[in-house]
């Protein structure tokens, strides 16, 4: 298992979906090294599991201001990397 600690900073999402997001991000980071590829993996998995349209941003330094559907937003850290995942559209 990964040694990356998950720290949820902000979430408007069910506990189960939050855990799915962390698990999915962990899998992505084990498979890929490039942030764009990690984001693509998470987005595609959530599109499959929870229906489109999900958006995912992965990185160490970014700001954001987004509109999301109710109960479909999470912002968390996995180790040193921030992950923003939300559904809109």
UniProtKB/Swiss-Prot annotation:
Coiled-coil region list: none
Protein task: Acts as one of several non-catalytic accessory components of the cytoplasmic dynein 1 complex that are thought to be involved in linking dynein to cargos and to adapter proteins that regulate dynein function. Cytoplasmic dynein 1 acts as a motor for the intracellular retrograde motility of vesicles and organelles along microtubules. May play a role in changing or maintaining the spatial distribution of cytoskeletal structures.
Species of origin: Homo sapiens
Residue pairs linked by disulfide bridges in the UniProt entry: none
Protein keywords: Cytoplasm, Cytoskeleton, Dynein, Microtubule, Motor protein, Transport
SMART domains: Dynein_light
GO cellular component: 9+0 non-motile cilium; centrosome; ciliary tip; cilium; cytoplasmic dynein complex; cytoskeleton; cytosol; glutamatergic synapse
GO MF entry, a single one: identical protein binding
Subunit structure: Homodimer. The cytoplasmic dynein 1 complex consists of two catalytic heavy chains (HCs) and a number of non-catalytic subunits which present intermediate chains (ICs), light intermediate chains (LICs) and light chains (LCs); the composition seems to vary in respect to the IC, LIC and LC composition. The heavy chain homodimer serves as a scaffold for the probable homodimeric assembly of the respective non-catalytic subunits. Dynein ICs and LICs bind directly to the HC dimer and the LCs assemble on the IC dimer. Interacts with DYNC1I1. Interacts with BMF.
Swiss-Prot/TrEMBL site (Interaction with myosin V motor complex) positions: 41
Pfam families, sorted: Dynein_light
Localization per record: Cytoplasm, Cytoskeleton
Protein name, UniProt field: Dynein light chain 2, cytoplasmic
GO biological process, one term: microtubule-based process
Keyword Cytoplasm tagged: yes
The family this protein is said to belong to: Belongs to the dynein light chain family.
């Amino acid at each position: 298992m990964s040694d990356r600690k998950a720290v949820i900073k902000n979430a408007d999402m069910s506990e189960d979906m939050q855990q799915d997001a962390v698990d999915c991000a962990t899998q992505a980071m084990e498979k890929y090294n490039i942030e764009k590829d990690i984001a693509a993996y998470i987005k595609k998995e959530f599109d499959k599991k929870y229906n489109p349209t999900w958006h995912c941003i992965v990185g160490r330094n970014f700001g954001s201001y987004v509109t999301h559907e109710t109960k479909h937003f999470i912002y968390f850290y996995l180790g040193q990397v921030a992950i923003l995942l939300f559904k809109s559209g």
